[in-house]
Regions:
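Outer membrane beta-barrel
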Residues: 44-71, 76-213, 222-224, 231-235, ...
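C-terminal beta-signal and adjacent terminal beta-strands/loops
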Residues: 347-383, 404
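Outer-membrane beta-barrel "beta-signal"
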Residues: 341, 345, 384-404
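N-terminal periplasmic/intermembrane-space "pro-region" immediately following the signal or transit peptide
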Residues: 2-4, 18, 24-79, 393, ...
Length: 404
């Protein structure tokens, strides 16, 4: 029999890896179902009580004043809040949720969304779109989950779920600042696949996941990516998370071309002050004539102070280094600082969140910079190394529950 080529051998190892994962999942599910059946036959359960469902929605709109006054009204290289000098609805969504609990083991999420922030966040600049991506982008977390009665409780989840990578959410209402940091826009906000989470004890929780790729709306190839997260909570005020994502993000799927991303988050929450530190590093060898090894790093240090029940203040310094331009599209180092003043107006199940925010971004590198009001050459918008933004945002939220 002829020897396998390097590429074929790599694919064989990849698929053998995922076959083993699939067999393990089937065995786990079989064990779970058998355990449930035995428990039901030996210990008949009382009539279950009504389950709690959560529903709501939000509307997020803002005006970002860019003092560079770019002719195209764009925040260069960004996937969220990328339109400036105009009023925009950046996100609007409605949702329905039910948590998986011991009394009602099946859970679900359904989220419908629209707005500027749903246009490009899950796509890739270097890979084709997933079939159906134009309507899939209107789905936020949309999944089913099951809490299996194994040990302390194994939670299985499948569908579109919130990413295990990163400190910041796609939805500004869930963040301390209105605009997201650079590292958030170049890592997944959502994932499409399956995951299994298990609490080993009150301090350690482990999660394994298999997803369709780095970006959930991209179709770089037919090989899934996989990863894990370990979460450690030594006290009620401190959390440490380490997450690894590994898989191919280009047409060439040999193992040497797989992308590796490591994300580390340390958060400390006190009564009024929350401090977090995030560092991620990614690397990937690009299949091209020279096969360059690309590298990028990101770090942020947000500090949030709840001045009162309604007022809060946040400052967030950050730095993003894209040595080869693999993620941002340009070889550059970006240093930024964001300062946010927030005021909340609660009313029954609704609330209004008002934010006034300033951010300054400085990009250095042969191809770095931000759009301005000049022209570098006919048909090409000029670039400035520094950008100042002043944002005013209004986020209206509604959240309630019913029992069924």
């Amino acid at each position: 029999m002829p020897a396998l080529s390097k590429s074929s051998h790599g694919r064989f190892l990849v698929w053998r890896h995922f076959v083993h994962i699939g067999i393990s999942v089937l065995v786990l599910l079989s064990w779970s179902v058998r355990t449930v059946a035995q428990s039901a036959s030996q210990n008949p359960q009382p009539q279950p009580s009504k389950t709690t469902w959560q529903y709501g929605g939000f509307l997020d709109f803002a005006y970002l004043e860019d003092f560079n006054d770019p002719a195209n009204r764009l925040f260069r290289s960004r996937g969220t809040t990328f339109h400036v000098n105009e009023w925009d609805i950046n996100m609007a969504a409605i949702y329905l949720r039910k948590a998986a609990t011991e009394s009602s083991r099946w859970g679900t999420e359904l989220t419908l969304q629209a707005g500027k922030d749903s246009e490009v966040f899950g796509f890739s600049a270097t890979a084709p779109n997933l079939p159906g991506a134009e309507w899939l982008r209107h789905l936020g977390p949309t999944d089913i989950s099951y809490l299996a009665p194994i040990g302390k409780g194994l939670t299985l989840q499948g569908g579109i779920f919130s990413s295990f990578i990163g400190y910041d959410s796609l939805y500004a209402k869930d963040n301390f600042t209105y605009t997201r940091p650079w590292g958030a826009d170049f890592t997944p906000y959502l994932m499409l696949g399956v995951n299994a989470s298990y609490p080993f004890n009150s301090k350690f929780t482990g999660t394994l996941f298999v997803v369709n790729g780095y970006w959930h709306l991209a179709n770089a190839n037919g090989v899934p990516s996989s990863g894990f997260q370990l979460a450690y909570t030594p006290t009620s005020h401190m959390t440490l998370k380490q997450t690894i994502l590994y898989g191919p993000h280009q047409a060439e799927t040999s193992l040497e071309f797989w992308r590796l991303l490591s994300d580390t988050i340390l958060e400390r929450k006190a009564d009024r002050v929350t401090i977090a530190f995030e560092y991620h590093v990614g690397t990937e060898k690009v299949a091209s004539s020279t096969n360059p090894r690309t590298l990028w790093m990101f770090s942020q240090l947000p500090v949030h102070w709840a001045i009162s029940r309604r007022f809060s203040f946040t400052v967030r310094p950050e730095v993003f280094w894209d040595r080869n331009g693999r993620t941002t599209g340009f070889s550059q180092t970006v240093k930024a600082n964001t300062t946010t003043l927030e005021y909340r107006i609660p009313y029954r199940q609704a609330s209004a969140i008002l934010r006034l925010e300033h951010r300054i971004d400085d990009s250095r590198g042969p191809n770095g910079g931000f759009f301005n009001d000049g022209a570098a050459s006919p048909g090409m918008i000029g670039l400035s190394p520094t950008q100042n933004l002043l944002a005013f945002a209004v986020i209206l939220t509604f959240d309630s529950k019913f029992h069924f």
